[in-house]
């Protein structure tokens, strides 16, 4: 296989990592009946606090922990608004996005004295797995890659196992389809929703951390650049199933990687920049008829007596 094709595929996987993390986050939240429209903002918060953590401690892994904790906190805010106070899910998510865009700029200026970008910090670097790197083609694509790729693969398996092989997963699936029925079965619907949305926030924030300490080792204003919204479309493309949702990120990753390699070709740059979004929309048009969202996603649940 030619070097250009291998480079294209390697770029596809790297670009897909943050999208897939965020898409898994959106899938888990919706499975519990809560639409996480705040993925964009939570990713931005995660990317910022990953840099802050790395800057303060000197360790990129501590930065990743900072990002995960910030995501859990933002997930708690979102689920409190949507489940606790019964706010509209979309409005609550948009509010999270606006808040994240503003607070990161304020904190950026407080810590680094600039509104544009932070200083360089320690990054996660690349992980080379000798066994995988020796496999033809596959080794060229994922033999040397961010350790977050392997964390992503682990998360896909764990979410699949949780949802389809455990009693807790069955409860989550029932809540997403019919929370009233889950309540009559003795399931603590609110507790499960809180846990799922907080875990969703953690996953989205880790995806955001990849953009900073997993790639350029710094934070830049609004660096998520719409990836949270793209991730929501990947949830639909993957039909709310962990493996297919994660693989859906490869669609955008391929288009984005192809865009990078078409720069300099005799094509209007505006058309090249539109390519990832056009391809995503086209794929969604074909996939939407086969997708089936959880029936109770975005709907408020009321316990008896409320």
Feature-to-residue mapping (PLM):
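Membrane-interfacial amphipathic/re-entrant helices at transmembrane-helix boundaries
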Residues: 1-22, 35, 49, 57-62
């Amino acid at each position: 296989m030619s070097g250009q094709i291998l480079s294209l595929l390697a770029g596809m996987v790297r670009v897909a990592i943050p999208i897939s993390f965020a898409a898994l986050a959106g899938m888990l939240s919706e499975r519990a009946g809560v639409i996480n429209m705040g993925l964009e903002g939570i990713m931005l918060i995660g990317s910022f606090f990953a840099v802050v953590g790395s800057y303060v401690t000197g360790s990129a892994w501590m930065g990743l922990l900072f990002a995960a904790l910030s995501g859990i906190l933002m997930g708690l805010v979102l689920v409190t608004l949507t489940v606790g106070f019964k706010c509209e899910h979309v409005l609550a998510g948009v509010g999270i996005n606006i808040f994240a865009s503003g607070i990161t700029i304020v904190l950026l200026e407080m810590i680094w004295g600039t509104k544009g970008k932070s200083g360089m910090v320690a990054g996660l670097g690349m992980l080379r797995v000798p066994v995988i790197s020796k496999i033809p083609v596959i080794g060229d694509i994922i033999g040397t890659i961010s350790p977050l790729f392997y964390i992503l693969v682990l998360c896909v398996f764990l979410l699949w196992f949780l949802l389809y092989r455990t009693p807790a997963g069955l409860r989550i699936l029932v809540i997403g389809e019919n929370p009233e029925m889950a309540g009559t079965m003795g399931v603590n619907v609110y507790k499960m929703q809180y846990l799922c949305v907080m875990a969703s926030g953690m996953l989205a924030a880790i995806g955001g951390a990849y953009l900073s300490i997993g790639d350029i080792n710094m934070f830049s204003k609004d660096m998520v650049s719409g990836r949270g919204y793209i991730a929501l479309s990947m949830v639909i493309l993957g039909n709310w199933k962990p493996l297919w949702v994660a693989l859906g990120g490869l669609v955008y990753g391929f288009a984005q990687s192809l865009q990078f390699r078409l720069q300099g070709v005799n094509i209007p740059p505006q058309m090249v920049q539109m390519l990832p979004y056009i391809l995503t929309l086209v794929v969604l048009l074909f996939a939407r008829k086969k997708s089936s969202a959880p029936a109770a996603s975005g709907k408020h649940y009321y316990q008896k007596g409320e």
